[in-house]
């Protein structure tokens, strides 16, 4: 295992539900490091770097990242993984909290870590949000998005 891979693996371990070492997580990043949660369209820096770690542990206290494949090329480490845990929520949504179901979830994810001088400079996380929501029993309300077509040229 190379040093950059070891750094990434150690960072993952700090974020597991049975560890929750937020200081260790933050210390894995450069001073100007950023965590981009691509699926949610959110970015975290500084003291907020641990926000998603805390959120995931609240959602799934037994959260664990099962690393399937790890590839390193220079200062880039790419990881294919499953984020696994038990949905003990609640899951906050714009419509209100979704109560926990106690179901086990296994969320396919791809993570890209860009390192500088032995620390994480940028972490881009691509979580399969649709699969996560489906496993939690949260389904899109397509009917509310469908609008009847009216006016000239409308199909009947």
PLM regions with names:
Residues 1-156:
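C-terminal and inter-domain tail/linker signature
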